[in-house]
């Protein structure tokens, strides 16, 4: 199964999956559609909260963090529901429908600037909670079904590479999601006669609130003239209202793309669900009871040992999760405030850097698989805990690079007083690109192999909920 070739036709894709269970490809495609929708939202979430509601970075970050916390907690709940009912497929379908409803709540355009902040911010948070709950019903349980495919001895040795393929498909969707979000937002701005500028939403809110310094006011006027197709605006308050409305509405329409992605994922899953394992049918064909034969054979002592092993692994990799989840928060803030948004004549948006990680995952996965395959052939493949330890060390290197590259940049308070940095004062975009490259290498040592490890170690009766404890930030955050 190694190495993988990333270009090609339907036959090329089939060749990669030839030695794997036939349900792996539809599961990966359904997951890719759902992840595409999720990453469309995550690429713009914090920037949407700031531009729509005028939140500062701290409060936008709190909502972002609580949302992620909800994803993990509700994922555990979703896993418990599926493990209790053994109806994994029904739980997955329900999750897709609930997620679509959540995206609908945040996709409906509402007045901007927001005059009734408590009402509309509450509606947005309810939408995010709904997405998190639907995500909890969907993600871990789909992974559990994939893991059950490899419980068959015929495919057991292919488990790690199978989950790596599954993981790579997640990232195919994640590559294009930020691009689509940017394209929809910028298209809507253009229909209103505006160009994109990352600093203007914050300046508009500052102007309307009377909070701009003289330097920031001067920059606000200059940028307003630069982005307006009809020349420099005379009424700056009207410009601020119009620009904020166009900017936020473009984000609302980008969230609408996520709804379409959920529906596509739903169709793929429904069309192929017969090829996926069904634990309830296995029970009926076996003992006729609600308890799997595998569960009967596993003693309580072994269950405890497996759970403690998983807890030990998670207690270590939680520090990797801390670093990884900065991609939608502090690294996005850094892209917006400190990074030069151009490479030569190519203009960039702050959100585009979130495509770097999945891009590198897709193109580095074959190399990592080939490396592990070569080591396995020589009998020298590192154990899963060793791979995780290596990955965490590589992740630390990524942030050392980031730290060294950002030495000397002005503090945030100074940037705010100035109304943003000029292009000449910003750092090269290759700093973030390089950081994402190194962080992705670390991720590939941890994430797909972590899902595989948990699918093997989790007691059968707890697979749905425990697969969400796997060392896999992208697949959960997601």
Where do the protein language model's features map onto the residues?
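Single conserved hydrophobic/aromatic residue that forms the stacking wall/gate
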Residues: 1-8, 13, 468, 473-478
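Intracellular loop-helix junctions on the cytosolic face of multi-pass helical membrane proteins
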Residues: 9-10, 14-22, 152-160, 181-349, ...
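Pair of pore-lining "gating" transmembrane helices in MFS-fold secondary transporters
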Residues: 20-43, 310-323, 437
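Central cavity-lining transmembrane alpha-helices of secondary-active solute carriers
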Residues: 65-80, 359-367
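Cytoplasmic membrane-interface "Motif A"-like loop-to-helix N-cap segments
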Residues: 84-96, 374-390
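C-terminal ends and interior cores of transmembrane alpha-helices
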Residues: 97-116, 394-411
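Hydrophobic core of transmembrane alpha-helices in multi-pass small-molecule transporters
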Residues: 119-138, 419, 427-442
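Glycine-rich segments within core transmembrane alpha-helices of 12-TM secondary carriers
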Residues: 164-178, 470, 474
């Amino acid at each position: 199964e190694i190495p993988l070739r990333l270009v090609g036709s339907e036959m090329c894709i089939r060749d990669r999956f030839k030695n794997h269970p036939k349900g792996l490809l539809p599961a990966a495609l359904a997951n890719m559609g759902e992840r595409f929708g999720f990453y469309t939202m995550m690429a713009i979430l914090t920037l949407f909260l700031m531009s729509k509601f005028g939140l500062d970075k701290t409060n936008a970050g709190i909502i972002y963090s609580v949302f992620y916390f909800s994803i993990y907690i509700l994922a555990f709940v979703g896993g418990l529901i599926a493990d209790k009912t053994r109806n994994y497929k029904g739980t997955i379908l329900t999750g897709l429908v609930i997620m679509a409803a959540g995206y609908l709540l945040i996709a409906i355009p509402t007045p901007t600037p927001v005059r009734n902040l408590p009402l509309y911010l509450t509606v947005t948070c309810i939408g995010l909670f709904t997405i998190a709950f639907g995500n909890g019903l969907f993600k871990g349980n789909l992974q559990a079904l994939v893991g059950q495919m490899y419980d068959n001895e015929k495919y057991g040795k292919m488990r790690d590479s199978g989950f790596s393929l599954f993981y790579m498909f997640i990232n195919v969707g994640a590559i294009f999601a930020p691009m689509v979000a940017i394209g929809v937002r910028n298209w809507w701005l253009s229909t209103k006669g505006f160009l994109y500028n990352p600093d203007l939403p914050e300046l508009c809110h500052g102007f309307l609130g009377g909070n701009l310094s003289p330097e920031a006011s001067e920059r606000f006027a200059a940028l307003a003239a630069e982005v307006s197709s009809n020349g420099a605006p005379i009424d700056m308050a009207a410009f601020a209202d119009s620009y904020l409305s166009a900017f936020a509405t473009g984000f609302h329409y980008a969230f609408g793309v996520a709804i379409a992605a959920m529906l596509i994922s739903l169709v793929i899953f429904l069309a192929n669900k017969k090829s996926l394992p069904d634990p309830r049918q296995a029970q009926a064909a076996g003992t006729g009871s609600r308890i799997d034969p595998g569960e009967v054979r596993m003693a309580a002592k072994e269950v405890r040992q497996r759970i403690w092993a998983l807890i030990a692994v998670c207690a270590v990799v939680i520090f990797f999760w801390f670093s990884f989840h900065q991609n939608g928060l502090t690294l996005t803030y850094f892209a917006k405030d400190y990074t030069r948004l151009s490479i030569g004549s190519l203009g960039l948006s702050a959100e585009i850097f979130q495509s770097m990680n999945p891009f590198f995952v897709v193109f580095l996965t074959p190399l990592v698989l080939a490396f592990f395959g070569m080591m396995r052939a020589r009998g020298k493949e590192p154990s899963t805990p060793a791979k995780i330890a290596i990955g965490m060390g590589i992740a630390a290197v990524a942030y050392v690079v980031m730290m060294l590259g950002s030495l000397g940049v002005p503090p945030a308070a100074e940037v705010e007083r100035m109304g943003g940095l000029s292009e000449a004062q910003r750092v090269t975009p290759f700093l973030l690109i390089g950081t994402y490259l190194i962080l992705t290498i670390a991720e590939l040592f941890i994430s797909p192999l972590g899902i595989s490890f948990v699918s093997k170690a989790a007691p059968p009766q707890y697979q749905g909920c425990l697969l969400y404890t796997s060392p896999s930030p992208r697949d959960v955050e997601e």
